[in-house]
Design a protein with these regions (language model features):
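Short, glycine-/small-residue-rich phosphate/pyrophosphate-handling segment
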Residues: 113-155
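N-terminal beta1-alpha1-beta2 submodule of the flavodoxin-like/Rossmannoid cofactor-binding fold
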Residues: 1-86, 90-109, 114, 170-201
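Hydrophobic anchor at the start of a short beta-strand
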Residues: 35, 159-160
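Beta-strand-loop-alpha "switch" segments that mediate conformational coupling across diverse proteins
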Residues: 161-166
């Protein structure tokens, strides 16, 4: 059974990013995928302190904190795709998403300890980004996309693409049929990628 881990960084349950996610998730579920979704704002997730406790055991996540990150770790390790879904705040993701990324880059990548072997526990996992922003995506979401591309390269992950949709302002309607269709098409392309079909995203 194919499984997807979806990390939701929006503080608003009915905000633009979560609205865009609905047809995206529905498309995957219609194909039989299991979608694990995590509302990061509702979870107990603490910031990385760079203590390197996680580097002492190269086989487990191993963080010193006893919080909800273990749930995310377990989901990621059993998933075929990781989806980072966040609105853009100051040209990057929201603070809870950034905390998760910081915790994962240490806990998953055993590059920083004393052991001779330095594995990436999640090497080969596929990553996609779904985001919303106020500027045109090429000016509003480009830094986040580039950051995640570098993050993936560092972590031996496979970046599979980004869907970014613009909102023109709080006095305008964000969601429409065209955005819904693009979300569905993005899900379809990612599904093809997961099935090892050659397809540009």
């Amino acid at each position: 059974m194919k499984r997807i881990c979806i990390l939701k960084g929006s503080p608003r349950k009915d905000g633009n990013t979560n609205t865009l996610l609905k047809p995206f998730i529905n498309r995957f579920e219609s194909e039989g995928y299991i979608c694990d979704t995590f509302d990061l704002h509702d979870m107990d997730i603490r910031p990385c302190m760079a203590c390197r406790t996680c580097q002492q055991d190269q086989t487990v996540f191993g963080c010193c904190y006893d919080d909800d990150m273990d749930k995310i770790f377990d989901s990621i390790m059993s998933s075929d795709l990781i989806v980072l879904a966040s609105p853009i705040y100051s040209w990057y993701c929201t603070p809870p998403m950034k905390m998760v990324l910081d915790r994962l880059v240490y806990g998953m990548n055993k590059y920083y300890g004393e052991g001779e072997e330095k594995p990436a526990l999640w090497a080969g996992k596929k990553v996609a980004v779904l985001t919303t922003c106020g500027y045109r995506p090429e000016k509003g979401a480009d830094l986040f996309e580039e950051g995640i591309k570098r993050y993936c390269k560092h972590s031996q992950l496979k970046f599979c693409g980004m869907l970014a949709e613009r909102h023109l302002g709080y006095d305008t309607v964000f969601f429409d049929d065209e955005k819904a269709q693009r979300a569905v098409e993005f899900a379809e392309k990612l599904s093809c990628r997961l099935q090892h079909k050659e397809l540009e995203i």
